[in-house]
Swiss-Prot record:
It comes from Oryza sativa subsp. japonica. This is Alpha-1,3-arabinosyltransferase XAT3. Glycans are attached at residues 172, 375, 443. InterPro entries: Glyco_transf_61_cat, Glycosyltransferase_61. Pathway: Glycan metabolism. The chain crosses the membrane at residues 20-40. The lineage of its organism: Eukaryota, Viridiplantae, Streptophyta, Embryophyta, Tracheophyta. Residues 1-19 are cytoplasmic. Residues 73-98, 126-138, 147-163 have a biased composition (Basic and acidic residues). GO terms for cellular component: Golgi membrane. The gene is XAT3.
Length: 576
């Protein structure tokens, strides 16, 4: 190597070394910056790389939007009820027997939640046989309480086993929402809803789907279809499937309900009968024939849906139960001035300007006044029932207003299950406090009008948890309902079924939960048994066990000394 070339080589190496160090510094700085971005805001890189929107901006399906936008109150109820997991404890023992006057039959009550039969395991919802051969629960409105009529026990035993069903809880509705939307109330062509127009149907309610149309509506019962006529040029193309009975998500119940197709159309059969009033379409199968469900599934929702029309509305009934319409004809005639149309036997094409398919329903035996048309409430329903049966008392009698008249106490008497074992002692205590005591059984053979008048004549009504308490709808304002809760951790069920509705109707409500010593279960289990230490733990065994143990096999012996303050408080409520 020449002497002059070495210094040049050394300078070249140094320059390359500086470039390399500079490159290392730049790359290092880039890596440090990238690491910082990944750690602090990883989504800024990930979403920009894969082209996806952040979660809060990503579009959601209609079903997801319905769930997300659901009111927080309903969401909370859904989660809590679902965690409970137990069917509501409904009433009662069933003695199904056909009733001649109704052309059908009425089943025993069954309690608000469910009451499967121990022999058959499940009890089916009532459904038509040859039009009106309906099996129903013994506890119906006209006598709601026990589901028992004297002399009918053995005769009804066989029929009872055929028509028992596990009645669903509120949580069932929400748990099965997805199944309902895809199976029992699926809509086709939802994407074809015309932009800017309201869909024909609203499937967002967790308990009931409802369709409502204004315009040229053609109802063709033979085809079980409701057609909404569209003008030429309209882009609307909707098809909905709906079962007009408010037990959304209860697939077993809805399997007995006729499905009605609601669709928009430019072609339809010619009208054969024109109506100047709106139409309301609903079903009478499901759990009708059960006192509590007659109200919570039909009468309360029907009032909520149809009351605004002041009688100028036409009812069309799918799955007709003739005996039911006869039993409740006073209520039906108060809501509609027109004879009901039997969907299954009508071959006309009825044309309306306004039609509603399905009934507005919310929680059990309750109207949500924030969502109901015209903000109807349970107080309005209570007033409506008193008016329908022409009941004389709108409010209780103030103590002292009529010195010779004693406050009246109605005790709902039961047989076979949840009986008062010391009824005479209870009567004596109540009379000692100044009550005039009336004892009655709210059974299937009771005349509704008579029983309504009896309930309306009293100031206080009491009874052990059961469908007979549904008759509180006839009580005057500010009357007191006292519910005796059997042993077994049934407090929340009892309040949900009757306590909350009673208070919403403007009644005073007292709930008395019996102690261990007041339960006949002490005759069946030792006092140190877990059933007394932790009854809630037995709910995990399912409703069959709950019903058989805490409902069917338990009677009540009230501790009159402990119960006395409840009656005294009811008396105080009658003071001005």
């Amino acid at each position: 190597m020449k002497a002059g070339e070495r210094p040049k080589l050394v300078r070249g190496v140094r320059q390359e070394s500086r470039r390399f160090r500079l490159l290392v510094i730049v790359v290092g700085f880039f890596l440090v910056s990238l690491t910082f971005v990944f750690v602090s805001k990883p989504d800024a890189i990930l979403f920009s790389l894969n082209g996806k929107l952040p979660v809060e901006q990503a579009p959601t399906s209609i079903l997801i939007q319905q769930k997300v936008n659901e009111p927080s109150g309903e969401s909370r109820k859904t989660s809590t009820d679902a965690l409970r997991g137990d069917p509501k404890v409904v009433d009662d023992e069933a003695d199904a027997k056909p009733k001649g006057t109704g052309g059908g039959s009425e089943e025993e009550e069954g309690r608000v939640l469910s009451e499967p039969d121990p022999t058959s395991g499940m009890m089916e919802p009532t459904h038509n046989k040859d039009g009106n051969g309906h099996k129903s629960h013994q506890e119906t409105l006209g006598g709601g309480g026990d589901g028992e009529s004297k002399g009918n026990d053995e005769e009804g035993e066989h029929a009872e086993q055929k028509h028992k069903v596990t009645l669903p809880t509120v949580s069932n509705y929400t748990i099965h929402d997805a199944a309902e939307d895809t199976e029992n109330a699926k809509q086709e062509g939802m994407n074809n809803v015309q932009q800017g127009s309201k869909p024909l149907c609203d499937f967002s309610n967790f308990r009931a789907n409802v369709c409502e149309m204004r315009g040229d509506v053609r109802i063709h019962p033979t085809a079980t279809s409701v057609l909404f006529m569209e003008p030429e040029g309209s882009q609307r193309d909707e098809v909905w499937k709906i079962k007009p009975y408010p037990r959304k998500g209860d697939e077993f119940c809805l399997s007995h309900i006729t499905e009605v197709t609601v669709k928009s159309s430019k072609v339809a059969p010619e009208c054969t009968k024109y109506h100047d009033v709106p139409a309301v379409i609903f079903s009478l199968t499901g759990y009708t024939g059960n006192l509590f469900h007659d109200f919570t599934d039909v009468l309360v929702p029907l009032f909520t849906t149809a009351s605004e029309f002041n009688g100028e509305v036409q009812f069309l009934i799918t799955d007709m139960a003739l005996w039911w319409t006869i039993k409740y004809q006073t209520v039906l005639q108060k809501l509609s001035k027109y004879p009901v149309i039997d969907f299954s036997k009508d071959d006309q094409v009825h044309c309306f300007k306004h039609a509603i398919v399905g009934l507005h329903a919310y929680m059990e035996f309750t109207i949500d006044s924030t969502k109901a048309p015209h903000n109807y409430s349970m107080a309005d329903f209570n007033r409506f029932m008193r008016g329908a049966y022409s009941l004389g008392r709108d409010s209780v009698t103030v103590l002292g207003e009529y010195p010779k008249i004693k406050p009246r106490l109605l005790i709902i008497k039961r047989h076979r299950t949840r009986m008062f074992l010391n009824l005479d002692e209870i009567i004596s205590m109540a009379e000692e406090l100044g009550f005039e005591v009336v004892i009655d059984e709210a059974n299937v053979s009771s005349d509704i009008s008579r029983f309504a008048r009896l309930v309306n004549s009293v100031d206080v009504m009491m009874g052990v948890h059961g469908a007979g308490l549904t008759n509180c709808v006839f009580l005057p304002q500010h009357a007191t309902l006292i519910q005796i809760v059997p042993w077994g951790g049934l407090d929340w069920i009892s309040r949900t079924d009757f306590g909350n509705p009673a208070e919403l109707m403007g009644l005073r409500y007292k709930q008395y939960s019996i102690g261990v010593d007041e339960s006949s279960l002490t005759d069946q289990y030792p006092r140190d048994h877990e059933i007394f230490k932790n009854p809630i733990s037995f709910h995990q065994r399912g409703f069959d066990f709950i019903r058989q143990t805490f409902m069917d096999k338990q009677n009540v012996k009230l501790d009159c000394k402990r119960f006395r303050p409840i009656l005294l408080e009811a008396l105080d409520n009658l003071n001005p």
